[in-house]
Design a protein with these regions (language model features):
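Charged, low-complexity intrinsically disordered terminal segments
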Residues: 1-180
């Protein structure tokens, strides 16, 4: 359920030590979204590397101030779609959008599925989302970093810290990440 995903995600975000990478198509300004935003800002102030990608066209109603607050707290924020003029360029970019919903925490915990960040998943909408640990998280991390670079985000020269080796007690079952 949306409640369960939100509770688990908030707990995992709270426990993040190294990095939080978050990429969402749809990020509302409702109560749950504000709690996640506050948590991201808190973790950035604590020294956790927090990167956030939002799909600009889907979130066009959100004023820049909302994201600027995140930036001031140390969250690195990028728009996936940056519409450019003239109008003919804008039209060709409307189909080049980021529909992913990905969270990677410390390179060890991942979330993906159909749920965006919205209170609508608590009451009206139903979708599937997964919490992943183990080797499969590397595929989500790769997908996020690819989107981050595409969105003009700056990257570190050393990627190894974002791909930690799995501990023996973590899942090593094969999984396929189909990035689209």
């Amino acid at each position: 359920s949306g409640h369960r995903k939100f509770e688990l995600l908030m707990e995992d975000l709270r426990n993040a030590k190294e990095s939080i990478h978050m990429e969402y198509f749809y990020f509302r300004q409702d109560q749950g979204s504000k709690q996640i935003k506050e948590m991201l800002m808190q973790k950035a102030r604590e020294g956790v590397k927090v990167r956030f990608i939002h799909e600009n066209i889907a979130n066009i109603v959100i004023r820049p101030k909302y994201y600027n607050e995140m930036k001031k707290a140390g969250v690195e924020v990028e728009k996936f779609t940056k519409p450019r003029w003239p109008l003919v360029n804008l039209v060709t970019q409307l189909n080049y959008r980021d529909h992913r919903k990905i969270v990677v925490i410390d390179g060890r915990i991942g979330y993906t599925g159909g749920m965006n960040i919205s209170d609508d998943y608590f009451v009206r909408w139903r979708d599937t989302h997964m919490r992943i640990t183990g080797n499969a998280v590397a595929g989500l991390q790769y997908s996020f970093l690819n989107s981050w670079i595409t969105a003009d985000g700056e990257v570190d020269n050393d990627f190894t810290k974002y791909f930690p080796m799995c501990k023996e007690d973590e899942s090593s079952e094969p999984a396929m990440d189909t990035t689209a």
